[in-house]
């Protein structure tokens, strides 16, 4: 939903004392208006849990990036990615076992191409992208870095939903999405 950026700016202000510009604050307000439109305002019937979890996920990711920023100044970016993976991997496997159940069955029955994709994401894509992100993050305020890093997510997700899942976008999606992107650009 691109709400990682406004949440990141807000958290960085309180936790890192990074003062956003007036333009960034206006951008945050505009982005929240876009989310209101995108989510089907004023009718949230049957959507509240999904929307709430999506926004919560954005906030948690942004909080994580704010917490990582001070570490990125002290630890090499690739080492930081490795340490985060070392601790988050087992936690995610445990959560999968609790929520999905039968995680061992999924792992033992995974096909060869699934393992290739997992290895590519875990050992090539993730270290390179997050390593570069943490390198840039250590020397720049969050409000300058997050919009650039996350700008490709909404169009990619929308196109994937349309072409891979056959979803039909609504006018609210386009209007709200455009407003969110304008807000993020201002940030």
Q: Where in the sequence are the language-model features?
A:
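Loop-to-transmembrane-helix transition segments
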Residues: 49-57, 106-128, 149-152
